Amino acid sequence: MLTVALTAASVMPMTVYAQPAFASGGEVKVVEGDVNGEMQGGVMSPGAMAIEGSDLKVNGNVSGGLVSDGSTVTVNGNVTGNGIDTVIAKKGTVTVNGTVTATDLSEKTGVLASNGSNLTVGDTEVGGKESTGVIAESGSKATAGNVKVSGEYMTGTSAYGDSTVHVKGNVTADGNGMTGVSVHDGDKSSLIVDGDVTATGENSVGIYGETGIIKIGGDVSGREAVITKGKADVTVGGSVSGTLVGIVAGGNAAVSVKGDAGTKTGAGMFAQENATVTVDGNVTGGTFYGELEDFEDVYPAIIAGTGATVIVKGTVSTAEGNGVAVGINCKDIGSQKGTLIIEKAKAGGEASAIYVDTIPGVSQEYILNSLPDIVVGELAAKNENFIWNSYDNDLYQNNPEDETIGELNEKIYAAIRYMIRWNNSEGGSFSVDGTSKYGEYDVAQENQELGITIQIAEGYELESISGGKAQVLQRPDGTWSVIVPRGGGVNLSAVLRRIIKEEMKNSRVSNPGASGSEEQTTVQKSSGYVEFQKAVRSQIKNAAPGAVLEVDGKNWMSFDRSTMEELSKRNDLTVVVRFRYLGKRWRVVVPDGYAVQTLLNQEGYSGFLYLSAVFGAVPEEA
């Protein structure tokens, strides 16, 4: 006979259960059905509670919250609470395979992991005031689905004391004085949100970071979208959008935004003290808060202190009106020399691209020495008034008295480093003499002459060379040169034409819309040709950024105007076209960044043979 000895730690299954579920003394208990909290001795006990190393499982819903103190609690259902800390793990492990709903909280927490706990819940919704949806503290880890809080002065989720919070969905905070996510203490604290962080209402903040690491996979929005200080390290995988300000970074904080950053009113970015802010996309400023609609001045897109590091890989621009792209605040002095690296700074209206707000009572030499290193690709402003400053003898009583605003402008111009850019290709490569390196950038300064040599590959010939905003001059020895203009914009490019076989050079198809097996004298807009163009346009629209797009021309011999217009919107794409001609398969490559609409003929077509003449065609096996 088989005998089984039962101990106090054995599994104790229960049936339909409405009263609180409780486990203690190391017991293992399984409760089938819903459980509710109840008043015991004038105190509301939670719906589920495990202490003293116990293991409690509830296969149902829990009303009245749950507590794990040094124990394990699993709920295969939903958890609700009213006016209480609804899910609490203290030195324990909690798993809720359902939702958590907490209502009418006041200075409470919907989900709390503390003292080294490990807590996992599903979607969490919390309402009330001065409360938080999900908190991890004192070395704990909390994982949740979507987190939504509503009410007044609520926070979606927070991490304290070297703890980790991971939200696998979105964080939404809706109400007055709301904060989406925050990290307050613990250099090793981390807060990760896979989706978006959205804070709406008056005085709302999307991200507030004082230390630790914050990583957001999607977009961040709020009245003030991102506020950081201390040693906070923030990464946003999407874009940042504020209604009052996009980013405020101070202390030694670091903020990295993979998309754009901007605001409706105020500055798109404040970079203060020793902060570092990197934006891979564009930065835009807004209007002045509360001004009349016809007020012509707008806020600078960026305001940076002299010790901050700002890197923008896109364009910095303002709202419509008179607005400075970048304002440098010389009164905001960090403990280090700052850096300002911007692809393009574009002023609004009558303003300058860069404005330097100087310090009263100091010399121009002092101001110049305090400025950050300025590295730009291009400055854009009306009438080429790219730089302006507030240096005014009468107002600031600067010394010496004979120094003027205009003189300081010229000294700032002389200190700017301009990015010098060029693209090499299969047909040839540039060699540029006279540049220097600033980090990853090749740079030169105003009025500096640069020597240019092009190494042309065998089978190619040079058709033309351009310097962007710089004029290219040919030297007697066959090389070229450019002089860096004020405002930069030096972008070297060359059109290299492949010398193709005689059979291609001498061949001609009079109908760009005809198939490769038949020449016609009139354009046949057949349904097959129309469908081919439609399919190519769809490829272009859906291509990943920077992709190499493979187009099978089948038996067609051209692109129409609509297709080329669509391609002109995607100058990041390289297009490889394969087509059949004279019994052979050919391949022609249209490089990224090319002005493709110039390849259209008068009838609005771009024939593959013409593309071959411009870019060169390579035969392939039939």
Q: Would you name each region that the model predicts?
A:
Residues F22-G37, P46-N61, L66-G83, V87-S131, ...:
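Surface-exposed loop/turn motifs in large extracellular/passenger domains
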Residues M1-A5:
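Bacterial Sec-dependent N-terminal signal peptides
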Residues P372-Y391, L395, Q448-W480:
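Surface-exposed interfaces of beta-sheet-rich extracellular modules
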Residues Q19-A23, G314-V316, N322, C330, ...:
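Extracellular/surface-exposed low-complexity segments
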Residues I367, P372-I374, S431-E461, R486-G488:
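Extracellular modular ligand-binding repeats in secreted and cell-surface proteins
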Residues K29-V31, I51, G60, G451-I454, ...:
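Glycine-rich repeat segments that build the extracellular carbohydrate-interaction surface of secreted
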Residues S10-G25:
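Sec-dependent signal peptide cleavage junction
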